Regions:
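C-terminal tails and terminal domains of large nucleic-acid-associated
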Residues: 507-543
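RNA-binding accessory domains that recognize and position tRNA/RNA substrates
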Residues: 1-5, 481, 511, 515
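A glycine- and charged-residue-rich anion-binding loop/surface
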Residues: 12, 36-40, 61, 345-348, ...
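Hard-cation-handling environments
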Residues: 189-318, 322-491, 495-507, 515
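His/Asp/Glu-rich metal-coordinating catalytic cores
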Residues: 2-66, 71-276, 294-308, 327-331
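Short Gly/Ser/Thr- and Asp/Glu-enriched loop/turn motifs at secondary-structure junctions
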Residues: 117, 405, 532-536
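Conserved hydrophobic residues forming the short capping helix/wall of the S-adenosyl-L-methionine
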Residues: 103, 391, 526
Length: 543
């Protein structure tokens, strides 16, 4: 009998980039295909996606992509992965619509989509998959129960909230679940996740008290929260408009498929704002993470063509900063206050709730599903470790709780669990149209350039005689202001000249040693004088 293999390709030791392959015999199904924001030291990088080398090597065996929901950390890599390893896509209506939109932006077609509903069962190779309703901060979220020959069962469960289909999960627990993978994002938080309805109550009070415009920044995918904003607009006689590309695109798509309901007389275009009093306006915008090009940031910096923040505006930031974005969000809040706005954010009012399960909800999931093995996923390593502890506190044997690292695979049978590998995994960086062509060496050079700048040393050498015909000329970028540091630049030029004068003639075979000599001696000269280490790039041209 073949064994079941669980192969994490992302989402372990990190929050984001979620992707897991399940393999049985000749069949592979992939759950989610997400991206993650680049770290601060990944200069110039737009997006980070999983390494799919393993899937590419086994392209003919991939039977399906199964999606839990439509957040970027679960679908963001689809335009880069699906063309390289095509297979049918299964997801709920909104999830499939969001993926279609992403593929259309990249002019990608010929992907089969299958829309599923909770309790649907599909067959993908050896796997039978049941979709189970769960609550999350986006519509159309589902868990999955995977069954394969030999009565192996996997419950892939990003659980959230109180409207999760607990009956179905409990039924699976009664039948016997071999292993459960459950998210770990909020495992450090005791208690329960606050209900999304609480946000609606806060919005109601803020709408009641606001005298001027209300500007709300949130994630465009949080359609339940957007609907609560719309409902308050209707109650208080306000009009709503959307600002920011993703906000406009997602809400338009959601209205088309019936996931968002906005009366025609409530919705207005941003160009029509001047036709209404401030007390009649609500603006829903991107920018809850302080992104430099987002709608809220451009408004705060008076860079938006049609909207600027002004006195009496109430600005609500209905999100918490993603780790790494705290400084950007703080700067935007400061700037909003400088503009005279009344700023409401989660530290001073309940304007955001998490979409992830806290400890008591996780305990309930473990109690209902009763898996033989447990594998914590979707979290940084400390979160995975804490979730493993929680499972043991609930009575699961230590040997049956398995924390996987990237690059490892887990082989499961009814009798044993073994960690195998290595599996090629990691991060692939997307920079513009380039995918995977930027690595650590390029990032190191970018970091060097960003810290100390660049000096280019240009030397002309006669092809026949090997004599220096021009230069050395120094071109500086991001190092010092040349007009105010002419003595320093002149000294650096003399250092380069001294290196060149050691050669009676410069042959092509000497170029490497000449360049290295210029770099080393100019580095020593500049560091001794001003304690800086610019990137030095000598260029020798034949004349």
């Amino acid at each position: 009998m073949a064994k079941l293999r669980i192969i994490p390709l992302g989402g372990l030791g990190e929050v984001g980039k979620n992707m897991t392959a399940f393999e049985f015999g000749d069949d592979i199904v992939v759950v989610d295909c997400g991206s993650i924001f680049p770290r601060a030291d990944m200069l110039g990088i737009d997006l980070v996606i999983p390494d799919i080398t393993y899937l590419e090597r086994n392209r003919e065996r991939v039977r399906a992509y199964l999606f839990t929901h439509g957040h970027e950390d679960h679908i963001g890599a689809t335009p880069y992965v699906l063309p390289r390893v095509p297979a049918p896509v299964y997801g709920t209506k909104l999830t499939c619509a969001l993926i279609r939109g992403k593929l259309a932006e990249h002019n990608i077609g010929n992907i089969q989509f299958h829309i599923v509903k909770p309790k649907d069962v599909i067959q993908a190779g050896a796997f039978s998959v049941q979709f189970i309703k769960v609550s999350h901060s986006i519509a159309g979220a589902v868990a999955m129960a995977l069954t394969c020959p030999g009565d192996f069962k996997i419950d892939y469960t990003p659980i959230d909230g109180e409207v999760t289909d607990l009956n179905t999960l409990a039924a699976w627990g009664s039948r016997g679940v071999l292993a459960m993978l459950a998210e770990s994002t909020n495992v450090e938080r005791p208690g329960y996740t606050m209900s999304e309805k609480k946000i609606g109550e806060t919005f109601h009070n803020l709408f009641k008290d606001a005298k001027g415009r209300i500007i709300i920044a949130m994630f465009a995918s949080n359609l339940h929260r957007i609907q609560q904003v719309v409902d308050n607009c209707i109650e208080f006689g306000r009009k709503i408009c959307f600002v920011g590309r993703s906000m406009v695109n997602v809400t338009k798509l959601a209205m088309e498929i019936g996931e968002l309901k906005i009366p025609q007389d409530v919705f207005i275009d941003v160009g029509d704002l001047d036709c209404y009093a401030d007390s009649e306006i609500v603006v829903l915008t991107t920018g809850s993470q302080g992104e430099p090009m987002s709608g809220l940031t451009r408004m705060a910096n008076s860079e938006h063509r049609k909207l600027q923040i002004r006195q009496r505006d109430t600005v609500i930031i209905s999100a918490t900063p993603i780790p790494g974005n705290e400084i950007m969000v703080s700067r935007i809040i400061d700037q909003l206050y400088r503009c005279g706005a009344n700023v409401i954010y989660n530290r001073i009012a309940d304007v955001h709730v998490s979409g992830h399960a806290c400890q008591e909800e996780l305990k309930l999931m473990h109690t209902l599903v009763k898996p033989k093995y447990f594998i914590p996923v979707h979290g940084e390593y400390r979160m995975l470790h804490r979730h493993a502890q929680l499972a043991q506190e609930l009575g699961m044997p230590e040997d049956n709780v398995i924390i996987l690292e990237m690059g490892q695979a887990l082989e499961l049978s009814e009798d044993e669990a073994n960690i195998t590998g290595p599996i090629p995994t990691g991060s692939v960086m997307v920079d513009g149209l380039g995918v995977g062509d930027v690595g650590n060496v390029v990032l190191r050079d970018r970091k060097h350039l960003s810290q100390d700048g660049l000096i280019i040393v240009v030397v002309g050498v006669n092809k026949e005689t090997g004599q220096v015909t021009s230069g050395p000329e120094l071109i500086s970028r991001g190092f010092v202001y040349v007009r105010e540091n002419e003595e320093l630049i002149s000294g650096a030029r003399n250092v380069a000249m001294n290196v060149l004068q050691r050669y009676d003639r410069i042959e092509q075979s000497d170029w490497t040693s000449v360049k290295n000599g210029i770099k080393d001696e100019m580095h020593n000269y500049l560091f001794d004088l001003i304690k800086r280490n610019p990137m030095i790039l000598p260029i020798i041209m034949e004349t």
